[in-house]
Amino acid sequence: MPAPGAPLSRTSRLLLLLLFKVSVSAALSFVPEPRNGTCLGESCSPLIPRRSRDAGGPRNSARDALRVHVPREKLEAEVRGATSWDLPPPRGGDTGVIEEAAASGPLGPPTKPPGAWRWKGAQGKEPSGHLGRREPTDSQLFRQTSERGEMSSKRDEIPQGSQEHSVKTEPEPRDLFYWPRKTGQLQGSHYRPSAVHEGRTLAPPGRALPQNGSADDWVPDQGGPRRGNSTNRRVRLKNPFYPLTQESYGAYAVMCLSVVIFGTGIIGNLAVMCIVCHNYYMRSISNSLLANLAFWDFLIIFFCLPLVIFHELTKKWLLEDFSCKIVPYIEVASLGVTTFTLCALCIDRFRAATNVQMYYEMIENCSSTTAKLAVIWVGALLLALPEVVLRQLSKEDLGFSGQAPAERCVIKISPDLPDTIYVLALTYDGARLWWYFGCYFCLPTLFTITCSLVTARKIRKAEKASTRGNKRQIHLESQMNCTVVALTILYGFCIIPENICNIVTAYMATGVSQQTMDLLNIISQFLLFFKSCVTPVLLFCLCRPFSRAFMECCCCCCEECIQKSSTVTSDDNDNEYTTELELSPFSTIRREMSTFASVGTHC
């Protein structure tokens, strides 16, 4: 028979077991499960399945029963090993703090979709004194990227002066994750390029890039020599006249000499062209050739002389590459025109000396004269065309701060030319020295001297067998022959330095200094201008018809000259026209002189 207190003791034991079971179950409900890296929101929290079991009734009782028998030490180890999502681990490593943090609220990020309100709540939970560096999620990267874009747009709106003060150097509490910016930007640096400069080369402080964006050729902001191909910088040209030095005296001498050549050449060549064009009785084939020569001399002096003098004084071409190409082209074309004109004059004088009466009775029409001039022009322009291809503008630094580099027009073939033109340019460059010497020096001098000697012999024979009426014409032919020889000697004397310069450049360039080459070049240039200036003066001195017409042209505006010329008788006028026309008494033009005299003018 059981004792009377046995049921009571059994009941108390059952109650103790039940109480122990309930306490263990309550402790297991707070144990966090290992967090899955792929879950988001409250689904990662162990409270959700626990609450679902409490609401829906007991489920998985077998697993719950197994958890009852798990030792307490293992449960505490799992609690210690579980990492918190929102709160950082305490420095002291106290397990009680971990349990309080786990029991105080749900673990992991909120379950609501990411948005501005969600991250504002997250910002308030993060302490300001510690920053955790861990791998962010996609939503966190999206938020930080959007915030960076907003900050860059705001920074563009802020002025440059206040932008540097607004850049933060330390992270704020609202930043979830903080790491250094992109490569090339140091942490805490105040230098933040704006979005408008992306993809461009930025110069370091104190330097300014040239306009083409090249980082190699930098241009300093202030002071120092300027380099690079910037078009905004202002370069000072050298003043050749101040201060007074040996170079400035040379510049004054060059300037005075060029003014004399310019004035004399312009007036003389214009006078020759006006005399031939405005006087009908001066329109012979020989005078037309001389007028053509005067036109090219005028072109050389009017166009090339100022450019060459400007380059000599400032070491800079006024029109840069255009003047570097066009000035040598016009000069070589002028040499060709002079060469062919002298040859044509020699042939014309030889025909006149062979049969004087027949020559002066023959009249050449305008088309014949134009055809001869066209042959001279086309031949000279075509032969000078390779000079345009060979000439290149070269710049050399003088070594002075703020001064423009010296520009030189050198013979250099560009590799960008087409293959055919490039081969022709190479061939011409190899044969240029002897072509220049043979065509522009030997041909006019030898041919003219030979023809002049033959013409002089013909004139002597004609003078012995001539009648009284032809002696005046033979004397005029002798004057014209001497004029052609004088023009040839002047031309040969002025072209010799150019050939010497070419020979020195081709064979002795290494042993001659650049200063000597520049001196030879400027001497050859001035002798070419001197030839163009002296040619009309030589015509007025040696050719009587030109001198008489020039004096009449100069005195045509004077009333005394006009009144004096009106008192001359008609016979004297006929003799004057006969002399100027170089006509014989048997010429048919003499009978028509009264008709053409009223058409022509003396100026």
Swiss-Prot record:
Location in or out of the cell: Cell projection, Dendrite; Synapse; Cell membrane; Endoplasmic reticulum membrane
Entry keywords, A to Z: Cell membrane, Cell projection, Disulfide bond, Endoplasmic reticulum, G-protein coupled receptor, Glycoprotein, Membrane, Receptor, Signal, Synapse, Transducer, Transmembrane, Transmembrane helix, Ubl conjugation
GO biological process, any: dopamine biosynthetic process
Mod. after translation: The N-terminus is cleaved by ADAM10 metalloproteinase; mediating limited proteolysis leading to the release of receptor ectodomain by shedding. In addition, cleaved by FURIN between Arg-53 and Asp-54.
Residue pairs linked by disulfide bridges in the UniProt entry: C324-C409
InterPro entries: GPCR_Rhodpsn, GPCR_Rhodpsn_7TM, GPR37_orph
Positions bearing the site annotation: Cleavage: R53, D54, E164, H165
Tissues and organs where the protein is expressed, per its UniProt entry: Highly expressed in the brain. High levels of expression were seen in fiber tracts such as the corpus callosum, anterior commissure, fornix, internal capsule, cerebral peduncles, and stria terminalis. Additionally, moderate levels of expression were seen in the pyramidal tracts and cerebellar peduncles, as well as in the spinal tract of the trigeminal nerve and the spinal fasciculi.
Topological category with respect to the lipid bilayer: Multi-pass membrane protein
Side of membrane Cytoplasmic, spans: 277-289, 347-369, 455-483, 543-603
Entry function: G-protein-coupled receptor that plays a role in several physiological pathways such as resolution of inflammatory pain and oligodendrocyte differentiation. Acts as a receptor for several ligands including prosaposin, osteocalcin or neuroprotectin D1. Ligand binding induces endocytosis, followed by an ERK phosphorylation cascade. Acts as a receptor for osteocalcin (OCN) to regulate oligodendrocyte differentiation and central nervous system myelination.
Protein name: Prosaposin receptor GPR37
Organism encoding this protein: Rattus norvegicus
